[in-house]
Amino acid sequence: MAFTLTNKNVIFVAGLGGIGLDTSKELVKRDLKNLVILDRIENPAAIAELQAINPKVTVTFYPYDVTVPIAETTKLLKTIFAKLKTVDVLINGAGILDDHQIERTIAVNYTGLVNTTTAILDFWDKRKGGPGGIICNIGSVTGFNAIYQVPVYSGTKAAVVNFTSSLAKLAPITGVTAYTVNPGITRTTLVHKFNSWLDVEPQVAEKLLAHPTQPSLACAENFVKAIELNQNGAIWKLDLSTLEAIQWTKHWDSGI
């Protein structure tokens, strides 16, 4: 079902990162009511830039580290919901690419995303009288087929795709729909230099960037298109400046 962002309230976790900031710029052009950015490091210049793009949109920043205990996330969300009354979309975008940092990669890329999602269900779950909502989780094409030199990062992104597909199937119970946007290799600081697992490939970043990539702005434009298309359970591939819905192959079914 098509979704209009006009007059909507959106929470964007890591909305000041490379793809995140360009996506935030595209979002404010859609005449949101509120864009609430949760990020680890404040960037007043970026917030001011977003506000200047569309002064009709209220842009708010809260410091947030996705690795905090879930109780702290719930406390922050209580503050946001008390102020806005309603939130329409949650975008989970926190991510790091450094396979030297195994525990932190898993904590940021997967556990933090699961915890933030779990926390907002307290406010959205229709079984608790909530209105439902939309979750957009940022995965990666490495969640389909790994960059095998960074198996920890790739593994977390595969987990995001699987978790989100499960959320989508739970929508009749919770009232919360979900889908993933999965960027291909995008020209951001994230991919300019990073560490492979056990240093199996010291030149992994350079080798990736020798192949065709996409600019961050093109990825951001397709990101917002995916939000507007609003297809529960969709697995979107955002690669080489295109947007494509992936048809996932089922190899097994639980039967329940």
Curated annotation (Swiss-Prot):
Active site feature: Y153 (proton acceptor)
A matching Pfam family: adh_short
UniProtKB keywords: NAD, Oxidoreductase
Record-listed substrate binding positions: S140
Keyword NAD among record annotations: yes
Residues annotated as binding NAD(+): 12-35
Gene3D superfamilies tied to this protein: NAD(P)-binding Rossmann-like Domain
GO molecular function, one term: alcohol dehydrogenase (NAD+) activity
Keyword Transmembrane attributed: no
Biological process terms in GO annotation: alcohol metabolic process
Catalytic activity: a primary alcohol + NAD(+) = an aldehyde + NADH + H(+); a secondary alcohol + NAD(+) = a ketone + NADH + H(+)
PANTHER family assigned: ALCOHOL DEHYDROGENASE (PTHR42901:SF1)
Protein name, entry field: Alcohol dehydrogenase
Organism lineage string: Eukaryota, Metazoa, Ecdysozoa, Arthropoda, Hexapoda
GN (gene name): Adh
